[in-house]
């Protein structure tokens, strides 16, 4: 006799006032089938993979079997989208199934994406096509393996439906795990409505859930703002360390927990371009690679505006305090960016003069159209083999004398570091990934999966688990695109 599926939900968001959500079940999908189950994450959450692979478990993951201790709901929020305020957005195709306490003692949301219509769907059908589900599964799990704060993918499912996007495609659901789904846009929703009590309730909830160490502080709302600023400064620098471009940094896509969320038109850079933008809906390049820190700071300013009534009853005093807190973003980001870029050159504790070394390299990469990931990964080989040729050949003009001048300066800087070349090479390989999910490979996986072949997707899902380790069996998935393979635009797919 099979054991009855049991999941220990511990729900708190549903205890907030009803203004925060609509209680509802997901739509029942006709034929749920498992595409991929993240077994390691299952175990981290105290779930049993074997049970979830059974049809009862698949039906649970897809929202068809609702357990008695679940309280599914759709969350409401607003947001600035490409700088324009939308007073109500909300979970238009997502349902929060409940909250779990993981093996580490931390609370996680269990959410479905593509689970049907909600009151916040507007003109949408509440569904997701297979492509966006596979993309988010791959990219979010890659980000996690790269060491970057992110929501996670617990599972991907077929729904048994066909959904119409550019044409008919298989319907799918992503089962997403997050520290929470509270966004800057959640605060904006209540601020726009002038509901200060709800802003306070939400702020207290975020503090209790994510920043309990400031719960009893007299200036806890200022400290809340500052904690989120710190988290986002760190996060954006980490994105840029690996050449990641989010593509749709609206305020409804920025979390209070500091996790990356929503991977619609995201991409990893191939050849380096400081102003690279892939998103088809970002015609002006608002969310281009170089502008991500500025946008994060702009979004945080919108959060600060919502918190002003809590920071000080005197608005002028509140504004001064919020501005002081926001002024910390640029130095925080710059410090972490300099640190991680120094580490990508083998310099563990970069000093001010190293900034020029970093900037000069990026200029050479820009003019030479070198691949972002491979340029940094090959530094360790230069140290261990004393051969520059492979590295130079990454540039369109490997004979450019400025490349050798830069290499000479870099090697001279490394000589001042009191550890062996072998140890520096090891450090380099621990921060410069061997493997990233390339845009053209993701697109190939999606097109093959739509035709019924998931083999390349399965291989890619395996490859992203250990991005800093060399695995020759995945070399076909890590090569930069040929000219005819280059992905020039990415799409939300909603």
Model-derived features: positions:
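Regulatory N- and C-terminal appendages and interdomain linkers associated
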Residues: 1-77, 283-494
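Active-site-adjacent bridging/hinge elements
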Residues: 12-17, 108-118, 203, 207, ...
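Conserved ATP-binding subdomain of kinase catalytic cores across diverse folds
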Residues: 31-34, 39-57, 62-216, 256-259, ...
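Short, contiguous strand/loop micro-motifs
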Residues: 25-26, 125-127, 222-223
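ATP-dependent phospho-/nucleotidyl transfer catalytic cores
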Residues: 133, 163-246, 256-363
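Short secondary-structure boundary micro-motifs
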Residues: 3-4, 10-11, 17-20, 81-84, ...
